[in-house]
């Protein structure tokens, strides 16, 4: 293909309709037909990136290989497509404005008055085409965050309008995702919210090419005809997106509805072969027909909101399917764990994952959880802060340093077994300043980590400021907590493990970010397998 084609996905009526899942599902189908496809997300908030956002407000912050702190939708894109994303795949209003203001300060606008149109919209359009101009992709799908009609989204909607016009016929299309609610009192689906949403989009100068309708009930042919007539689309372009039991069913549902076929027709592209979803459907079959069930505790600080640990929960789905096992993830708030109730909270579980996080709140509960699973031979997996808690717990209860701590929690601790990284000590800005992105790790032979990975050197994604303090490495090693993975350049300990334990591993990095449907992460796969063994015993 000579020219990259563009698909824009907008949303109406309400937020959280699943634009990201629809975009990822369409991309999966187009990828399955042989088209090189990527997805990008444009977020209307003024933060430069979501790295400093409270997890309760935004859900997890997803990290790419190149160290970008991004929206959690990029995790969905990677999990569906099995292709890495980058900084270019996520743009925020804050980043756009920052770039334009920096250009103005450098004098790049030749003294002109800088305005939303054309300067902000031109910046948005340039970023929308950045991946397309790389030559790596046939089709670029762009998800516009927010809801049509929101004041924050207006510059993006205007940019889409201009870009579709500039690209010319068959080179750019708009998919509008909307809600068709069911009124139980009337016993029928109502199309009026969708009609008004499309009308709002048209007032901005954009005609939707395809309508994707989220619904709890089947759309009748009459209803589809009505939507087509009043929303000015062809009947074949009215796509039903009925509620599914798992997001991984959505590509098949969109295939049945013909979303990819309609999109290709609008873009004047050949259908090529039918999408190859053989491996995807094998995964789905394993997911829906498990042979056993395990209960794994997720000990964290933000467990009230599932999106805070989105990638971890999805990684358990991938690992569960790989083991033909249903993984029941039981959320346990670390603030609610203490020495008196830890057995009641964790005693019946088949495994415990101590989750990542920041700050002092709930720390003692995490440390108590690590102690209990270590002493009772329950499979343990610690990620980032969870790994650091295992080091603190071991230092306190095995080395006898009762006041061992991280300098994040206590700057004056006499035993800082977890310490601020040297390169972080003079940094004052919070945004984008952590140790971020993919870093190498050398794995020692004859260790649990080596059995899991089967490789000498791995690359994993990081997001942290604090690290294992190597001053205590010899003592911890002699006492049994092995450092089995180390960064080859800095000597930073990345993996710790216990030898005489069914499964005990802590990692400084975030393996959940690299788990996909096609490649479940090996630590999660082995952790679930260990939980299965524990359950059988």
UniProtKB/Swiss-Prot annotation:
Reaction(s) this enzyme catalyzes, per UniProt: UTP + L-glutamine + ATP + H2O = CTP + L-glutamate + ADP + phosphate + 2 H(+); L-glutamine + H2O = L-glutamate + NH4(+); UTP + NH4(+) + ATP = CTP + ADP + phosphate + 2 H(+)
E.C. number: 6.3.4.2
Catalytic residue positions: 384, 510, 512
Record text on activity regulation: Allosterically activated by GTP, when glutamine is the substrate; GTP has no effect on the reaction when ammonia is the substrate. The allosteric effector GTP functions by stabilizing the protein conformation that binds the tetrahedral intermediate(s) formed during glutamine hydrolysis. Inhibited by the product CTP, via allosteric rather than competitive inhibition.
UniProt binding sites for UTP: 15, 190-195, 226
Residues reported to bind ATP: 16-21, 73
Protein name in the entry: CTP synthase
Gene: pyrG
């Amino acid at each position: 293909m000579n020219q990259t084609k563009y698909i824009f996905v907008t949303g109406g009526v309400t937020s959280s309709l699943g634009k990201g899942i629809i975009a990822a599902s369409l991309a999966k189908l187009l990828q399955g037909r042989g088209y090189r496809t990527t997805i990008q997300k444009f977020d209307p908030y003024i933060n430069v990136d979501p790295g400093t956002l409270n997890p309760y407000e935004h859900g997890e912050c997803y990290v790419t290989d190149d160290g970008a702190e991004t929206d959690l939708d990029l995790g969905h894109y990677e999990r569906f497509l099995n292709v890495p994303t980058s900084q270019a795949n996520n743009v925020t209003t804050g980043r756009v404005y920052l770039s334009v203001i920096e250009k103005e300060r450098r004098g790049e606008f030749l003294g002109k008055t800088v305005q939303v149109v054309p300067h902000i919209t031109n910046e948005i359009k340039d970023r929308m085409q950045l991946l397309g101009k790389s030559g790596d992709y046939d089709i670029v799908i762009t998800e516009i965050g927010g809801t049509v009609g929101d004041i924050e989204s207006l510059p993006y909607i205007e940019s889409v309008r201009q870009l579709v016009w500039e690209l010319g016929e068959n080179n750019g299309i708009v998919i509008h995702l909307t809600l068709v609610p069911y009124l139980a009192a009337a016993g029928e689906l109502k199309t009026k919210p969708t009609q008004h949403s499309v009308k709002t989009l048209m007032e901005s100068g954009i005609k939707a090419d395809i309508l994707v309708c989220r619904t709890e009930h089947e759309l009748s042919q009459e209803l589809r005809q009505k939507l087509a007539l009043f929303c000015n689309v062809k009947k074949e372009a009215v796509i039903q997106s009925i509620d599914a039991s798992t997001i991984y069913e959505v590509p098949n549902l969109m295939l049945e509805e013909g979303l990819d076929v309609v999109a290709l027709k609008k873009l004047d592209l050949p259908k090529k072969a039918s999408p190859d979803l053989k491996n995807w459907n094998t995964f789905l079959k394993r997911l829906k027909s498990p042979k056993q069930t395990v209960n794994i505790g997720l000990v964290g600080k933000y467990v009230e909101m599932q999106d805070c640990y989105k990638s971890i929960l999805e990684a358990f789905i991938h690992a569960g399917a790989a083991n033909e096992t249903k993984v029941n993830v039981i959320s346990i708030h670390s603030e609610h764990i203490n020495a008196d109730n830890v057995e009641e909270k964790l005693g019946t579980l088949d495994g415990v994952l101590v989750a990542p996080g920041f700050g002092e709140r709930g720390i003692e509960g995490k440390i108590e959880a690590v102690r209990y699973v270590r002493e009772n031979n329950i499979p343990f997996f610690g990620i980032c802060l969870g790994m650091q808690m295992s080091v603190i717990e071991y230092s306190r209860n095995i080395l006898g340093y009762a006041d061992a701590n991280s300098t994040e929690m206590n700057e004056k601790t006499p035993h800082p077994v977890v310490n601020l990284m040297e390169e972080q000590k003079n940094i004052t800005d919070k945004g984008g300043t952590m140790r971020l992105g993919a870093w190498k790790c050398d794995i020692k032979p004859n260790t649990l980590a080596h059995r899991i990975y089967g490789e000498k050197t791995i690359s994993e994604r990081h997001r942290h400021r604090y690290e294992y303090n190597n001053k205590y490495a010899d003592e911890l090693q002699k006492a049994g907590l092995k450092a089995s993975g180390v960064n080859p350049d800095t000597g930073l300990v990345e993996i710790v493990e216990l030898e005489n334990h069914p499964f005990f591993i802590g990692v400084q990095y975030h393996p959940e970010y690299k788990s996909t449907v096609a490649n479940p992460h090996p630590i999660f796969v082995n952790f679930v397998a260990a939980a299965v063994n524990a359950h059988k015993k």
